[in-house]
Amino acid sequence: MNNDERISKPMSWVTTWGTAEENFIATPEGMPRPLEDTTVRQIVRVTTSGDKMKLRLSNRYGKSDVVIRSMHVAKQVKADQSAIDMSTDTAVKASGSEEILIPAGEVIETDPLDFRVKALDNIAISMYFGAAPSAADQMTGHRGARATTYQVSGNQVATEIFSSPATTTSWYFLADVSLMSPAGSKAVICFGDSITDGFGTDWAVPGKRPDTYTRWGDFFAERLQANEGTKHISVVNKGIGANSILGSWPTDSGRDRFKRDLLGHDGVGYCILLFGVNDLLSLSDTGKYDRLIPEYQKMVALCHENGIKIYGAPILPFGKSQDHTEAAEEVRTRINAWMRSPESHMDGIIDFESALADPEDPKSILPKYAPLDGLHPYDGYETMAEVIDLTMFA
């Protein structure tokens, strides 16, 4: 289906940006000042184009209601600044009201609004808070935004540029942004851990900084938009740092959050699964293989039951990591062999492993890609995106 044919057919909602919800119990030092009577401006990058938008707001981990007294969306002027394009500043409502209530434990949708964006635009979402939790274990958001969030006192949702704001690099109460999209448009869920979440693309690594959009998913989105046949495909990053398939720290385990992260968005057509390395760190025996394979099988089955194609990405080598063991290497090798086999029922393989492995030491990532710890290939994220076959999404 070409673009003209898509536009002529009925349109539907498709998620253009999203993040993996978690609580902040692991990093309470990363919290902003108390939220009540402050404005928080958060920056997200949409991955497709459209002119009608809605947002999902989440209080999934909250034990009390969140009250947003006023909320606006606008285009950001420059990637590392709080300034907005005032000609685009638009109020956001839910159920017809400018004051938005997010009940404890719930996720809500805003009303649709007219707001034109181009793919890869940065938008600023400004929230003026009334009641809001401040305890880390009751806050819903995402620690590793890799983008700057700005906080100032009072109601400044329509202020062009903040003066001396407090800053963090996390998102708060945002779940996703969807656009009314042409027929055939689909979202890709990138499901994983810190490698998908983009560890190493901000202050965690000397010389790096946030607001650069250099996660592998960011480069992938840019490639999709540069190719005429895939401009209708959006990218939704569902990576969480330190997350594992079986373990429930620092937030819900991969197996527990997969269904909601897959099906909780609009228009999902694909899933890229790069997950499991944290389950193997410091492994002393090979028994985890028999525990992990059934979880992968459940993920594949859930995708297929819902008409979603799932592409497996074999677990990356980490032989130069301090947490590498021979048992871990054996399990990694066996999992990857299973994933590549017909028995896995994957719809295809995205071979990040071969692209990053050291030819002289295949159990390790090339040092130039993961110089800090041999585990996170933050200097190889662009290489990862380049090996993805775009015809898998055309």
Description of each model-found segment:
Residues 17, 36-37, 41, 65, ...:
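Conserved SGNH/GDSL esterase-like catalytic core that processes O-acyl groups on lipids
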Residues 191-193, 313, 350:
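Active-site flanking residues adjacent to catalytic metal/cofactor-binding acidic residues
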Residues 1-191, 196-208:
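N-terminal secretory targeting modules
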Residues 281, 316-394:
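Catalytic His-Asp segment of secreted/periplasmic serine-dependent ester chemistry enzymes
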Residues 296-304:
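Surface-exposed amphipathic alpha-helices with a cationic face
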